[in-house]
Amino acid sequence: MEKLKALIEVTKPKQTFLLMITFLVSYIVARGGADFNFVIAAISMFLAISGTTAINMWLDRDIDAIMPRTRKRPVPAGILKPSECAAFGAAIFAIGQVLAFLVSLEFGLVVFFGLFFDIVVYTILLKRKSPYSIVLGGFAGAMPALGGWVAVQGFTLPGFIIAAIVLLWIPSHIWYISMHYEEDYRMANIPMYPLVVGMERASWAIVFATAAMLVLAASLYVLLPLGIFYLVISTSAVAFFLYKAVKFALSPDRVKARKMYKLASMTLGLVYFSLLLGVFL
C-alpha cells in the first residue's frame, strides 16, 4: 500500500490535476462539448503528464534530497527505488503517447513535445545551469492546453492563445514559490531567476507577463464565440492578479510570495472556468 501511495505521489496529483483542467477545458471549448474521442485523449494526456512528472522526480532525486521542502518525496526518502520511479514514469508515458497518436498525429506530437520540453530542455539542459530555465521549459506546462485544442481543431490560432495564457502564467507559478523557498534553492545550487537577478526584477518580469496574459485573455473573446461571462470573469481575475503583482513588485517579500503563488493558481483556474461558462452560457 505504501508503494502504491508513493507511485501516486511521484505524479504530483495536484499539479497534474491543474494541468488536466487546462486540457479538458481547452478540448471542450474547441469541440463545444465532449465526445468519445475526448475520453481517449483525456486518458492519454493524464498518463503522459503523470509519466513525465515521475521521470522528472527520478532525475531530480539528488536535489530533492538536499532541499527540506522536497526531501520527504518518495525517491529521496527511500520509499521508492530510483529505478522503480523511472520505470513507472516511462511505462505510463509510453502508453499515453501511443494513445495520443491514435487520436491524431498532431495531438501525438503535442504530447511528445510536452515530454521533450519538460525532461530534455528544462530538467536536463537548463534547470541546474540557467536562470532562464522556465522561459523555455515553461512550454511543457502549456502543452496540455494546446493538446486539448489540437485534438479537435488542429493547429489554429485560438489554441496557441489558450496555451500561451498558461505559458505567461508559469513565471508567477514558479518564481513566486522560489522566492518563498529561496534558501532551499540556494542549498541545491539551482539558479532560479529571482535568486540570480533579485526578487524585485523578477517580480516586474511577472508583472509584464501577467499584463500580456490579460491581453490574450481578452483576445479570445474576439476570436471565439464566448459569452460575456467569459470576458468579465477572465479579465477581472487577471486584472486583479496584475494589480496584486504590481503591489508585490513595489515591495517584494518572501512571506507574501507564497500568497502570490496561491493567488496565481486561483487566477488561472478562474480563467479556465470562465472559458467553460463562455461556451455554455
Swiss-Prot record:
Superkingdom of source: Archaea
Pathway(s) the chain acts in: Porphyrin-containing compound metabolism; heme O biosynthesis; heme O from protoheme: step 1/1
Keywords: Cell membrane, Heme biosynthesis, Membrane, Transferase, Transmembrane, Transmembrane helix
Record field: catalytic activity: heme b + (2E,6E)-farnesyl diphosphate + H2O = Fe(II)-heme o + diphosphate
Pfam families in alphabetical order: UbiA
Any one of the GO BP annotations: heme O biosynthetic process
Compartment list: Cell membrane
Listed name of the protein: Protoheme IX farnesyltransferase
Origin species: Archaeoglobus fulgidus (strain ATCC 49558 / DSM 4304 / JCM 9628 / NBRC 100126 / VC-16)
Gene: ctaB
